């Protein structure tokens, strides 16, 4: 008869960002443990609050399934000695399996006999196997860990309770000096220690102590309560998904409420108010029906509605202190001069091995000028790029950004506009930080995009030049994100700038502040980001073929990958790729100094292929270019069928290899076709 299993680990308050992934990890690790230990089950449900991680297994088998395994040993000629007795090799083999030589039998495998033994292992009761669940808890990994008391071990937070119930039976085991039982803890202020009656009563037992164990239920409660506030007050609340996920992992019993602040603070830029509420206080922003910010906020209390008015007043008081700071900095920063702030950037360190922020900006300005030409910007845009590059980091020295660093760039744009800077310059100051996340928004203006590219390129080259190169998952300076941003911006704007030539030109630049180095590492790093941009939906062989193309133009590479994926599902893909691959492989033997001499042609097929190559212009979309190459497949095959490429006559051989080399030089602008798999 199946049973239900409950495991709850009671801890000190967990960081909010750890709760959800830890809940998921616990469920996955327990499922693996049960499967590996041959304990079948029907379902696994996970639970979490800031002070607990839990999992319930439904329909758990009462006993392991029996195990029968065959083991192959040494060959018979090795297993038996000259007298026909079992050798030490045979005896050692069966001993290692916990058996005797009586279990040996011989089976023929590919014409030769080998020792075989069959081992039968009866399934153990689930109760006995579950004593090993502490291995699951020990194997949990966390971004941070700590020691406590005089213990030598470390964990995400101190462990206070461990509950392990099989139906209503408490299992006895120990974990980190905690002995398991059936006692859990209720809400820190509203509840008490409570007894969990059974695995099935878990949620109800905790609910009686003001703990909602199911994170999904807490989320639904928060959303429903906010919706009720919206209906009652006639407002709209910005239910930000990330903030919602954070808040539900800060509370065990949620109660949402609305507070207010003086409308005078609405004169401060909206971004300052939103940052104060959302990022610093974990409040939800409130708007009117037209979407305008209102002097209100919604917060979620960890508790019931008892004395809620006092809670509201306390939250309002804390927020006002933040808003006072914002109002002060907004007023005082407007007294500053951009030129004075830029001058002070010479004293701000970009990185101790690289130099000052002013030096970084100087290099960025030079790179931006080069990119502006490559991107065919207008004269007005070129001027805007140059001006933006001279000042774009000035807001880092304002009081507002010093207090609210999330507003860097945003406040720069606002202060630049107030100072009379051109709108394109001001916008670029904000946009140069974009994208600020893996799938974040991209710059919308060409000026902002060029500045963003230049800033990211110098950042990448500078850190690589001083040996600060990401390894493994370690990337403290977010260089992968910066490089991914470079790739995304180039693709978004369709700028066909050859990255290899661009990087070469940057390494030719001379700066007093820094000499660029490690170019090969930089190029490989950029290629890896293009590879990631293609995504797992693009087969590995296609990604590799595109990455080995002769033109490192990001939009064209991504388009080529997409075209090849679509083409791979067509009938002519395999024959076309195979003929092109043959041409690519032979062309590697060509002498680069030899040019095609039509007077050496001995058959019509040579002339036909050469003429087709001469007429190959590769115009249009990536799909159209690919089709133009693929239609040459019959011509290529006809050439191979009627021409001995590797002729004994050296002149003929070199000429024919030169024909193929001409073909490859054009086709390789799309992909290295000999890297494609047609099996």
UniProtKB/Swiss-Prot annotation:
Keyword ATP-binding attributed: yes
Keyword Aminoacyl-tRNA synthetase: yes
Transmembrane segments: none
Domain of life: Bacteria
Signal peptide as annotated in the record: none
SUPFAM superfamilies: HD-domain/PDEase-like (SSF109604)
UniProt keyword annotations, A-Z: Aminoacyl-tRNA synthetase, ATP-binding, Cytoplasm, Ligase, Nucleotide-binding, Protein biosynthesis
EC number(s) reported in the record: 6.1.1.14
GO molecular function: ATP binding; glycine-tRNA ligase activity
GO BP annotations listed: glycyl-tRNA aminoacylation
Cell compartment(s), UniProt: Cytoplasm
Pfam family, one: tRNA_synt_2f
Enzyme class: ligase
Catalytic activity: tRNA(Gly) + glycine + ATP = glycyl-tRNA(Gly) + AMP + diphosphate
InterPro entries: Gly-tRNA-synth_bsu, Gly-tRNA-synth_heterodimer
A Gene Ontology cellular-component term: cytosol
Subunit structure and binding partners: Tetramer of two alpha and two beta subunits.
HAMAP family: Gly_tRNA_synth_beta
Membership in a protein family: Belongs to the class-II aminoacyl-tRNA synthetase family.
Protein known as: Glycine--tRNA ligase beta subunit
Organism: Streptococcus pyogenes serotype M3 (strain ATCC BAA-595 / MGAS315)
Name of the encoding gene: glyS
